[in-house]
Amino acid sequence: MPGSVTSVFGGPDDFHAALREDGVLSLLVTGNGPFRARLTQVALDHMHLSTGDEHLSRIAFVGVPADTLLVSLPIGDRPGPIWGGVETQASELMTFGPGQRIHTRTTGPCRWGAIRLSSEDLAEYGRALSGAEFALPPIARWRPRRAALRQLSHFHHAAIRTAEARLAALANSQTAHGLEQQVIHALIQCLSARPVDQETEAASRYRGLLARFEDLLLGEPFPSMDQVSVTLGISKRMLREYCRKHLGMGPDRYRRLRGMQLVRRALRSGAEETSSVCEVARRYGYRDPRRFLVNYRALYGELPSATLQRTPRRTATRSK
């Protein structure tokens, strides 16, 4: 059933939770200061549209759900996310096929748009409209005709604007169906030409190594770089090179920031009331209390003791 939700977030954990259905497996804030983000999500019968407005740099690890195509499109004149080390222009789209795993990062305030729909549905509509097979590469960058991209952006924006204004139009099944058909038609027009760039075998292999790095950190948050290198079967030099391209930083710093996030999450969970901040920090690999406190305050804008009593702020309005 069509519906929508617009949310404002004061903490990254709630923001991440809202993005899980879109395939966001992890979210790591890398910018300093208070977290602020706004997210509007629109669910139609056969697709989901969303737009996000973020104020701090972050790295997200995305796993596109099975039988799903994910489309990243530009919003306004703000820079969009960097996908797998690839920067996109305001005139470009990125598409990601079912099951693809990739890192996406921002380097400051960012606004982005996304479309998520069944890859089989898109292929069926594409065949019907073009009269030929409609198959997309696993990951590709597109530069549609200006008129086609303008039309897609218009329909995407119309759905988002309707949701944010809390209008009842999306609750009308005929209106929602008509909007969905317009978005699909405009999207197929944008993807009918050849992509300007598609992932090479080498790039796919490098991306897979970074996905395995995430798997390793999930099971062992603080592996040594020697251990990571041996497990992934690459040199430490190559690991650093891949991480800088995809993550915007070296593997050691990424690992430490993830550790800081785990500490913050533990402090906010309410399960650490009988533990000191230093005990929690040591449990997650931080041996120097003074350095930990300085780095924590620089990253989150508050001392760990304040985190113990701080509640994430979130407001949301829903319409169906």
Predicted regions and their residues:
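N-terminal low-complexity or simple alpha-helical regulatory segments
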Residues: 1-67, 72-73
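Alpha-helical bundle regulatory/interaction domains
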Residues: 1-34, 80-226, 230-236, 249-250, ...
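Short aromatic-centered micro-motifs
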Residues: 42, 81, 292
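Well-ordered mid-protein domain cores that form the structural environment of catalytic cofactors
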Residues: 49-50, 56-102
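Short, conserved glycine- and acidic-residue-centered signature motifs
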Residues: 64, 206, 256
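Aromatic (often tryptophan-rich) hydrophobic motifs at membrane interfaces
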Residues: 228, 238-239, 254-263
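Short hydrophobic/aromatic patch on the recognition helix
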Residues: 239-243, 247, 291-292, 296
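DNA major-groove recognition helix of helix-turn-helix
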Residues: 243, 251, 255, 296, ...
